[in-house]
């Protein structure tokens, strides 16, 4: 991915039912009309099974021509489990990964063999050399667990110094936050592509909950506007307009 090129990717959640998989398959094929660099597939938190991710990736790989990029998280996992997942992805012909630390669910015990994303990145490169193309995550508004924005930025740039393609950000709704983040990264010599992550607005309660959990700050103007809508269809319509404007900017 060229730094200044304009590309799209779409992120999917693994469905929990066969009918959900069929519906996702239809959606993904429709999305191929908008050429995407890749489709990414998320996974469960805290080292939970990644079988759903693999099943979804396999379906999309067979049904579409778009490259598929499974998310893989190190938190709560040991080397054997991660290696098993990586070999399964390689056997399927998948070459792109989104590598994350991941979040521990409440009450989870062991952090596993990979306390940070950079540990997992190093492990993947040691085991598979340059077979996988790696994207990483980033928090333009600072990771909720970070000691300070400065330390968070330092650790992010350390992660980007590895043999990775670039990064995808956590969602945000203030474009100035993203542009400032890019500027701060470049001051530290971190110049690989950082793709903005944009989440559709379809439900007010879900948006507020996810923003709180992820440390994403919602602009007051957005909150005020959302408060004027009581019907979900109206929220969705406004969300499409708002996010479309954000993407254009």
Predicted feature residues:
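Conserved N-terminal beta1-alpha1 strand-loop-helix module at the mouth
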Residues: 1-41
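Hydrophobic faces of well-ordered beta-strands that scaffold small-molecule active sites
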Residues: 6-14, 39-41, 68-72, 97-99, ...
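Active-site mouth loops of central-metabolism enzymes
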Residues: 7-23, 68-80, 133-151, 227-241
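Active-site-proximal loop/turn and secondary-structure-junction residues that shape catalytic pockets
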Residues: 12-16, 43-47, 74-76, 101-105, ...
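Active-site pocket-lining/capping segments in soluble small-molecule metabolic enzymes
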Residues: 19, 112-139, 188-248
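Active-site-adjacent beta->alpha loops and helix N-cap segments on the catalytic face
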Residues: 19-21, 47-60, 78-84, 103-125, ...
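Catalytic cores of alpha/beta
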Residues: 77-90, 151-155, 179-183, 203-209, ...
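Active-site glycine-rich loop that binds ribose-phosphate moieties when present
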Residues: 145-164, 177
């Amino acid at each position: 991915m060229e730094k200044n090129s304009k590309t799209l990717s779409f992120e999917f959640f693994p469905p929990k039912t066969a009918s959900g998989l069929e519906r996702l398959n239809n959606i993904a094929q429709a999305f191929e009309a908008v050429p995407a660099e890749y489709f990414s597939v998320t996974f469960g938190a805290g080292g939970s099974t990644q079988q759903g991710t693999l099943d979804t990736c396999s379906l999309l790989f067979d049904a579409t021509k778009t490259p598929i990029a499974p998310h893989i998280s190190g938190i709560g996992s040991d080397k054997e489990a991660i290696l098993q997942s990586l070999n399964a992805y390689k056997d399927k012909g998948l070459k792109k990964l989104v590598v994350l630390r991941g979040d521990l669910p409440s009450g989870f015990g062991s952090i596993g063999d990979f306390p940070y994303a950079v540990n997992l990145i190093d492990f993947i490169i040691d085991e598979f050399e340059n077979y996988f193309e790696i994207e990483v995550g980033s928090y333009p508004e600072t990771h909720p667990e970070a000691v300070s924005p400065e330390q968070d930025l330092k650790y992010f740039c350390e992660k980007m110094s590895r043999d990775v393609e670039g990064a995808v950000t956590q969602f945000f709704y203030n474009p100035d936050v993203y542009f400032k983040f890019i500027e701060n990264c470049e001051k530290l010599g971190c110049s690989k592509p950082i793709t903005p992550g944009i989440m559709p607005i379809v439900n007010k309660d879900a948006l507020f909950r996810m923003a709180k959990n992820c440390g994403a700050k919602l602009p007051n103007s957005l909150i005020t506007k959302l408060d004027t809508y009581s019907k979900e269809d109206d929220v969705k319509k406004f969300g499409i307009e708002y996010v479309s404007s954000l993407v254009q900017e």
